[in-house]
Regions:
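N-terminal positively charged helical leader segments and presequences
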Residues: 1-71
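N-terminal small/glycine-rich loop or linker at the start of catalytic domains
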Residues: 3, 73-79, 180-183
Length: 242
């Protein structure tokens, strides 16, 4: 018998039937072509996995009877906010997808000086919604049951004035390497765009309590740097191990 895993924004309760939301129903019915009796693992972001069976499946609505639930054990022990400068093409999308797989807690798209993307407020909102769907898909694939929030794009100066974290790190390929010491309760990780943050932005970050972090002698692309940084932090303080 086939089994699938899907996100639904609807409330989920054991021994109750749930009509899945439009996104989940469309994917299950039209892409995966589920049938009555197929097993599903459903999550809604509350940290639990809900198991059940499809009781009805039409082109527009899939319903599932939830029969059991258990807490997910896939969340990182680190509370990490990734502030990543927006980049052109699909590089930003790829980066946030992989960051989700690596356990990031939240994502903030940053509009720094060297970000070469100009959109209207309406298009930025659509971008934010699209990025959130990418994160949801990454959670479905990776087994996560808590969905990282993708914030509205914001300027670097605004984010720096608002962010709160025990450990604040900004990537800088010119920084002096230093060791990571005691495990923090929360981390804010700032990564610039192609070409890096402007010198004035690095200075502003340091003035707001950030420490420079260097990831080795090579210059990493803007979509590669988050993966390396999150892997280093996860191996040092989190649940990434060999």
């Amino acid at each position: 018998m086939r089994s699938y895993r899907v996100y639904s924004s609807r409330p989920l309760t054991v021994d109750e039937q749930c009509d899945l939301d439009d996104r989940a129903s469309h994917h299950l019915a039209r892409v995966l072509r589920v049938k009555t009796g197929d097993r599903l693992s459903v999550f809604n972001g509350d940290g639990n996995n809900y198991q059940g069976a499809v009781v009805s499946a039409s082109k527009h609505q899939v319903s599932v009877l939830i029969d059991s639930t258990e807490p997910a054990e896939t969340e990182s022990s680190l509370n990490t906010c990734l502030a990543l400068a927006v980049s052109k093409g699909d590089r930003f999308e790829w980066a946030i997808k992989k960051a989700t797989e690596l356990g990031v807690t939240s994502i903030v798209p940053i509009l720094s000086q060297r970000v070469d993307v100009r959109l209207s407020p309406e298009r930025w909102q659509k971008k934010q919604e699209h990025w959130q769907q990418i994160v949801i898909s990454a959670c479905e694939q990776s087994g996560r049951a808590v969905v990282p929030e993708v914030a509205a794009p914001t300027t670097l100066s605004q984010w720096l004035s608002d962010v709160e974290a025990d450990c604040k790190l900004v990537l800088d390929p010119e920084a002096t390497p230093h060791a990571l010491h005691d495990r923090p309760a929360s981390i804010a990780l700032l990564i610039g765009p192609e070409g890096g943050l402007a010198p004035s932005e690095l200075t502003l970050s340091l003035e707001n309590g950030f420490s420079s972090l260097r990831l080795g002698p090579r210059v990493l692309r803007t979509e590669t740097a988050p993966l390396v940084a999150l892997s280093v932090l996860g191996a040092r303080w989190g649940d990434i191990n060999a």
